């Protein structure tokens, strides 16, 4: 199959409404970001981000098409005119040229939905829910975001182990009460300090949300609210997974979906972009310390 045929198949089988807006050719994020789509496809590498290392691994696996969820050259729209003198850009471009690799971004079509258990489901967050093992606990399976779950009760320690294993993380940033009992979990929209953060704060309080798994998150609004709530003895916490880290599970799930869509005519493989963060532990100190609740209530 030609790469162009594969791209067409991916677009045609997906939903056409992304976050409430029709997918339009002039405005969609989903574009061929690099390479010649008229060549025969030798293999497809699925990844959240086509990093330099992902490109190298794709070449070693014999793949000449990378399907990525995020931009290739570090900016919305993947504009490259401003990067001509950038040495990292030049090296990444040379690597793509050396191996004849195409990069196609599949963002809007994946979020618009893939066929799953009947109706269309957001391809990223259905994949996240599936690989976390939380589909039976999803309170609104057809929602994009927020995703809300009522899982069997667990401790912070148990949740940490589950997240580190499923997402294959180097560590995870934690905010809140380390003694929290977790059952009601929410994956919210990005927490960016916008006025809408007040609605999320109200929802956490009103619906008794125990735990947030966050993507983008600034250090004020909801983050500071959760810290104060935990210090006041409430059963609240945040696992700050990170935008790219969290959505990576969705791309991992997409491998099996795309392979079925193409009737296994082309090999499809997942290459993990890897944890966006590394952690340098404080020697001789607790990595996560939390004052006793009664210090704040006395």
Label for each model-derived stretch:
Residues 1-298:
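Active-site catalytic microenvironments in core metabolic enzymes, especially phosphate/sugar-handling
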């Amino acid at each position: 199959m030609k790469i162009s045929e594969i791209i067409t198949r991916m677009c045609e089988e997906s939903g056409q409404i992304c976050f409430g807006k029709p997918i339009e050719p002039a405005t969609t994020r989903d574009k061929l970001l690099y390479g010649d789509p008229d060549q025969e496809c030798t293999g497809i590498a699925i990844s959240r981000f086509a990093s330099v290392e992902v490109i190298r691994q794709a070449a070693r696996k014999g793949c000449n098409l990378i399907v990525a969820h995020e931009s290739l050259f570090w900016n919305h729209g993947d504009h490259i005119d401003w990067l001509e003198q950038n040495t990292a850009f030049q090296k990444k471009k040379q690597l793509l040229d050396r191996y004849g690799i195409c990069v196609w971004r599949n963002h809007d079509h994946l979020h618009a939905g893939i066929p799953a258990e009947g109706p269309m489901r957001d391809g990223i967050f259905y994949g996240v829910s599936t690989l976390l093992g939380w589909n039976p606990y999803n309170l609104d399976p057809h929602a994009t975001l927020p995703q809300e779950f009522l899982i069997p009760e667990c401790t912070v320690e148990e949740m940490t182990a589950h997240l580190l294993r499923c997402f294959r993380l180097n560590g995870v940033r934690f905010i809140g009460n380390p003694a929290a009992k977790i059952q009601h979990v929410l994956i919210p929209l990005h927490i960016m300090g916008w006025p809408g953060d007040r609605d999320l704060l109200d929802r956490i309080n009103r619906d008794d949300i125990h735990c947030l798994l966050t993507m983008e998150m600034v250090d004020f609004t909801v983050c500071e609210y959760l810290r104060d709530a935990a210090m006041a003895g409430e059963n609240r916490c945040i696992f700050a997974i990170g935008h790219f880290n969290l959505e990576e599970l969705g791309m991992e799930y997409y491998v099996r979906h795309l392979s079925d869509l193409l009737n296994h005519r082309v090999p499809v493989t997942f290459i993990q972009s890897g944890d966006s963060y590394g952690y340098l532990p404080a020697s001789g100190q607790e990595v996560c310390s939390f004052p006793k609740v009664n210090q704040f209530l006395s």
